[in-house]
């Protein structure tokens, strides 16, 4: 389980990205890099980390499912992920 402060920081970044998305796109299109540089650092989508929705783990996350590899395997074996089954050939 990730620290709650790390999860909260990432959620704050997600909100900032949403808040400044339109302004950032306009400035980028206009080529106003000086104004773009003055925006908050955390308003850049690059700083957002994909995290597991259950554990907060930041590495080994399947973005399509929003789960880390451990939880993905657990739920897949329990049959809780529709359409996912263990490969066999």
Swiss-Prot record:
Family matches, as Gene3D superfamilies: 30s Ribosomal Protein S14, Chain N
Is the keyword Ribonucleoprotein assigned to this protein?
A: yes
| Gene Ontology terms for molecular function | rRNA binding; structural constituent of ribosome
User: What organism does the UniProt record list as the source?
Assistant: Pelodictyon phaeoclathratiforme (strain DSM 5477 / BU-1)
Which protein are we looking at? Small ribosomal subunit protein uS14
Q: Does the keyword tRNA-binding apply?
A: no
Q: Which GO terms describe its cellular component?
A: cytoplasm; small ribosomal subunit
> How does it associate, per the subunit comment?
Part of the 30S ribosomal subunit. Contacts proteins S3 and S10.
Annotated InterPro entries:
Ribosomal_uS14, Ribosomal_uS14_bac/plastid, Ribosomal_uS14_sf
